Amino acid sequence: MILWSPSTCSFFWHWCLIAVSVLSSRSKESLRLSWSSDESSASSSSRICPLSNSKSVRLPQYPRGFGDVSGYRVSSSVSECYVQHGVLVAAWLVRGNFSDTAPRAYGTWGNERSATHFKVGAPQLENDGALRYETELPQVDARLSYVMLTVYPCSACNRSVLHCRPASRLPWLPLRVTPSDLERLFAERRYLTFLYVVLVQFVKHVALFSFGVQVACCVYLRWIRPWVRGRHRATGRTSREEEAKDD
């Protein structure tokens, strides 16, 4: 019969722990190797796939450099713009060297808070070679503070911005005025002109009212009153004749 002493048991237990640790380390190493092999295979497959399909992908060509465009530019310009009855009318006369007879251009109007772009029609060629741009925009904001034209002398040139500050345009006797005109004058701080326009409108409406009253009185006295009197006389005559017959 074998007797297990305490020293023998501790020795046996020590060697069991060593064996278990060795086996666990080998299993971890094999698992790490298998995981690394899977990752390497996945990365190699992901690298190989695009190369196999690279023949079907067409890369864009590198853009060629533009030539010398320093000669294309806007040399001078004259602008005129105004607002009347809520309609913005603007015109620009542009001179310079352009690569095309109708260079690309667009317009912008707005104020300090917002801006709105609009299309500009084809320019008109003047006798001296200048280009004339004209535009007419209805129902614009009465508080607009600027309108500008952006012109590109060539396709690769920097833009040239031509500014213009519109002002309200009214005749010396403003008989026809819209609320937009009054709002525009108030926004421009032309208070004296604003009061003058209001006074003219007040006098105009008073004159129209008095004229209407006079026309109504004339019509009544000329046609309506004689017709009413004649009708009363006719009815009175017929009533008297009927009374005489009854008697």
Curated annotation (Swiss-Prot):
Q: Where in the cell is it found?
A: Host endoplasmic reticulum membrane; Host cytoplasm, Host cytoskeleton; Host Golgi apparatus membrane
Q: Which residues lie on this side of the membrane: Lumenal?
A: 28-192
Question: Main site of residence?
Answer: host cell
Regarding the membrane, this protein is recorded as:
Single-pass type I membrane protein
What is one cellular component GO term in this UniProt entry? membrane
Task: List each copy of the Ig-like H-type domain by range.
Answer: 72-168
Q: Which GO terms describe its biological process?
A: symbiont-mediated perturbation of host defense response
Q: Does the keyword Transferase apply?
A: no
Positions in the Cytoplasmic compartment:
214-247
Q: Which UniProt keywords apply?
A: Disulfide bond, Glycoprotein, Host cytoplasm, Host cytoskeleton, Host endoplasmic reticulum, Host Golgi apparatus, Host membrane, Immunoglobulin domain, Membrane, Signal, Transmembrane, Transmembrane helix
Q: Which residues are glycosylated?
A: N97, N158
For the keyword Signal, the answer is yes
Kindly list the residue ranges recorded as spanning the membrane.
Answer: 193-213
Concerning Pfam families, the annotation shows: CMV_US
Its biological purpose: Influences cell-to-cell spread of virus in polarized cells. Promotes dissemination of virus across cell-cell junctions of polarized epithelial cells, maybe through the association with the cytoskeletal matrix.
Q: What is this protein called?
A: Membrane glycoprotein US9
* Organism, as annotated: Human cytomegalovirus (strain Merlin)
Name the gene. US9
